[in-house]
Each structure stands twice: as C-alpha cells, then as structure tokens.
Design a protein with these regions (language model features):
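A generic structural signal for tightly packed, nonpolar segments enriched in small/aliphatic residues
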Residues: 1-162
Length: 162
C-alpha cells in the first residue's frame, strides 16, 4: 500500500525500518561480523522459491563460507547481488533515502542495499532474505515454519570463530 504521512511516501516495507535500526545498533559495538535474517521481501521468494533463502553478503569469502556450510549441512542458500547501481532506486527528493523503490525490478537486491546503508562501513555483513515457510512437507522437513539459512550460518560461525 502507499500512504502519505507527514509528506513522506511510505511503502509496505516498514519491517526493514525496524531492521535498519537494529543493524545500526549492532554496528555501534563494531563487531567483526553481523548476520541478519528476515522475511524481508516477496521478491526473494519469487526469485529462489520456498526452499532457498536469498543470501546477500558484502564480502565474497563470507558468502562462499555460508554457501559451503549450507551445502554441507543440508541448508542450501543462494547468493543474490548487492548491485550498487540499483542504489539509484533508493534516492529521494525529500529524504536521505527511500526504504522501498517504486519499480518492480530487483526488489530483494534493492531492499538489501537499503539495509546495507545501516551497517557500519568496515563491518563484514551478511543478510538472509528468507521465506521461512515450507508450503509442503518433505522428508525431515515438515510443512510450516522453517529456519532456512540458520544451520548454514551456525556452521559457518562455528568454523570461523570456533
């Protein structure tokens, strides 16, 4: 939905505002790595379906470690780009940035670029945009809520930090 509120155009993307605040707060401690997971966009679900969370990462080595851990531990994920050129779509005439763009292109990547603005510049960051729901049961995976990407992240963290 679109609604005008105090001269700001707000799109149905309010959850990313809360996540942006959380990422800003997490960055204050200057951690080595931040990983967040959210049911951020329907665009990720459309792009990779219900079985794979979309993965965005600033650093290739972090993305590769998460992809490897996911593959080894039966929790595959799929990397999508943080394509900087799409950041143009977050420009605003009245604010520092928009939280959602007005076209239908690259919705998951643009949402991830929005979040990227709120993570400290020198911090390694990875973001899972996950559907978190299994529409049909599979062996060892019942129908319903599912923490897609969680095992991949946990195993990568254990490998990296012990």
């Amino acid at each position: 939905f679109d609604a005008y509120c105090d001269h700001l155009l707000v799109r149905d993307a309010e959850g990313r505002l809360i996540l942006a605040d959380a990422l800003t707060r997490a960055s204050e401690e200057k951690p080595e790595l931040v990983i967040d997971m959210a049911t951020l966009t329907g665009a990720a679900r459309v792009a990779v379906g219900p079985d794979l969370p979309a993965l965005f990462a600033r650093r290739d080595e972090t993305a590769e470690a998460l992809l490897r851990a996911g593959k080894i531990n039966d929790d595959p994920c799929w990397r999508l780009p943080l394509h900087e050129a799409y950041g143009e779509w977050l420009k605003s005439d009245i604010a520092d940035t928009n939280n959602a763009h007005a076209n239908a292109f690259a919705g998951a990547s643009v949402a991830a670029l929005f979040l990227d603005k709120f993570v400290g510049k020198d911090i390694d960051w990875a973001h899972f945009d996950t559907f978190a729901w299994r529409p049909a049961g599979k062996p060892g995976r019942p129908k319903g809520g599912d923490a897609l990407g969680l095992r991949a992240a946990w195993h990568m963290l254990r490998e990296r930090f012990g």
